[in-house]
Amino acid sequence: MNQKILEQLEFQKVKEQFQPYLQTAQGIQELRLLEPSNHYDKISDYFKEIAEMATIFVENHHFSIGNLRDVSESMRRLELEADLNIQELLDIKKLLLVSGEISRFYQDLENVDLQVLKRIFEKIEVFPQLQGSLQAVNDAAFIENFASPELDRLRRQIAENERYSRQLLQDILKKNADYLSESLIASRNGKSVLPVKNTFRHRVSGVVHDISASGNTVYIEPRALVQVNEEMTQLLADERHEIARILKELSQLLRPHSRALANNAWLLGHLDFVRAKYHYLVNNKATIPKISKDKNIQLLNVRHPLLKNPVANDLHFADDLAVIVITGPNTGGKTIMLKTLGLAQLMGQSGLPILADEGSKIAVFDAIYADIGDEQSIEQSLSTFSSHMTHIVDILEESNSNSLVLFDELGAGTDPQEGASLAMAILEQLRLTNIKTMATTHYPELKAYGIESDYVENASMEFDSQSLKPTYRFMQGVPGRSNAFEIARRLGLAETIVKEAEQMTDTDSDVNRIIEELERQTLSSRRRLDHIREVEQENIKFNRAVKKLYNEFSLAKDKEIEKASQEAQAIVELALTESEEILSKLHEKAELKPHEIIEAKSKLKSLVPQRDLSKNKVLKKAKKLREPRIGDDIIVSAYGQRGTLIGQVKGNKWEAQVGLIKMTLKEDEFQLVKVEAEAQKPKKQSINMVKKANQNGPRARLDLRGKRYEEAMQELDAFIDQALVNNMSQVDIIHGIGTGVIREAVTKYLRRHKHVKSFAYAPQNAGGSGCTIATLG
């Protein structure tokens, strides 16, 4: 498709209307590169994708990809043996997560027949092991302690060093209080320092890091702290080195799969783009047009996509119709109709829904050419006519029988008689070479050309003679007429003058009267057609409502049958129980022989209906949702750490990837993380309580890491209350090591609480001093 037509018809602005519906960087990129195609099968597949996406939304009501950043540069860096940074790993982690979710979404689809989208969904690869490894990077772009034993050890040492350093500073602060400008610990050049009065600078031994602007205060790092700070500097350097090593290891894990991951990003972006097309279709009352294998265009109630309140029009450009000539005065909407046809074709050939009614049809052209507006080139010093004619010459040379040509005000800018003759000659050349053409003109001579020539049709834009305003309604088959006399009358020009003018143009008046009658007939036909369409739309709505009621009735009927079956079974089971009691009593009285009792019991049991639950769709779906599957995110109950299931060992045992560590877990040792459900529910302020495996009674876990003091204490208080209400026997409180402030506050709180029997740090393999286990009672 030639690029000039995309600029002339502002196709870029049309594409921009789809961007708000996109969620992924790859989807936005696909939209940016979108251009019209001239391949019938390709366009057909585009339309089938939208139709299939519609069936997905009908059955599931929601389908979301989620925000995915561009990972193409990260994939290139992997191929160049470069190591990725934390943000890049986080982006890939999100890609892996969404890939797994969409793959599971596809597997769970029911009552949906996909042909084209099936190929997209089934090409998405899932990598549960990689997903589990990247759990080492949390959503805050922070490398978790469990990423490696060495990192965990270093961070424990750093926390201990910070605690010792702070305590040491507090002691020094108290000891040298009389020498200080302020009783506080300051920071200079990343070092903890004391603000010492200049007059006492020699009383405090240490390294001077700064002096205040007034010179009255000297900031000294106490000598006792120098060695501690040097150790801290080394620990922080070791931490950075270990993080770099972990990033390198994670990059090496991803490198062999870089192309597959890039392909996943493209597939998800494409699904996102199809989803955006569907939402545009629904929100703009657009339609998926049929594709004509010949050049038969049929646009029903087509609208211009860039106008705020466009007037809908019908356009029938049959295969045997070569040229449509729109005649009539300016400002009636002729150019808009021309552009509407061009944009409908560009959108359709790009696989986009068009703003028209169902039943519309587009053709497939190799190229679309247009000469629209004043394209005068000042640099070339060309007149308006010369500029247009230069462009028209190019169009005539480049176009062929599989092109669509659009001319606005053909032949304008020169002597009217010569311009009209040129316009007719150009249209005749296009007609003879069977090039589909729509042209606008205000030359009356072209009306006769439209009537006298085969495969040519006149058209015009409706004008309201009462309001003296154009209606912008397209009138196909009716040539345009001048409304000058009628307008003059209504504006108050003397009737004698108007009649004299009419007598001077008797022939034209006769033609105008014929055209006026044609307009009336066309308007009457259009009203009848509009009424028929309204009835059709009502029938469609009625049909949909009936289907909906039928489905609801079927579902209600199934529920009633299920309920009746349950009640019947309960009655029979009750009767069976009572009968067994009677038989047992009779047996005790020896009134029946053992084999007679067995036979009687057998007959009674045969009365109980055996319910086939395998066909119960609700139970099947619920069971499927509850079952763990490869790729599911989990929380390990014993540690509260997040991981991903990468395989089923046997029975109820699963292999999980937690950071860089693999674990074998039973199903009661982890909980599934329902990411989709969490994303869809509105967020509420709640206590971060995660259920644990049942060890010596109910237990729960509260994570206070990263919380401020006041926030942590409020959550702890609410958590203990909730645990007591739920009869929890033990709870785990994760506070981390950090500065020790939260840990000490937790200890004080538990010591004071009358319902806390005892508490202690967790075992070393379950959190150590970073986690406190409290026994309640």
Curated annotation (Swiss-Prot):
Transmembrane segments: none annotated. ATP binds at G328, P329, N330, T331, G332, G333, K334, T335. Pfam families: MSSS (PF20297), MutS_V (PF00488), Smr (PF01713). GO terms for molecular function: ATP binding; ATP hydrolysis activity; ATP-dependent DNA damage sensor activity; endonuclease activity; mismatched DNA binding; ribosomal large subunit binding; rRNA binding. Keywords: ATP-binding, DNA-binding, Endonuclease, Hydrolase, Nuclease, Nucleotide-binding, RNA-binding, rRNA-binding. Its EC number is 3.1.-.-, 3.6.4.-. One of its GO terms (biological process) is rescue of stalled ribosome. The keyword Hydrolase applies. Residues 702-777 form the Smr domain. Endonuclease that is involved in the suppression of homologous recombination and thus may have a key role in the control of bacterial genetic diversity. Acts as a ribosome collision sensor, splitting the ribosome into its 2 subunits. Detects stalled/collided 70S ribosomes which it binds and splits by an ATP-hydrolysis driven conformational change. Acts upstream of the ribosome quality control system (RQC), a ribosome-associated complex that mediates the extraction of incompletely synthesized nascent chains from stalled ribosomes and their subsequent degradation. Probably generates substrates for RQC. Homodimer. Binds to stalled ribosomes, contacting rRNA. PANTHER family: OS10G0509000 PROTEIN (PTHR48466:SF2), OS10G0509000 PROTEIN-RELATED (PTHR48466). Belongs to the DNA mismatch repair MutS family. MutS2 subfamily. This is Endonuclease MutS2. It comes from Streptococcus uberis (strain ATCC BAA-854 / 0140J).
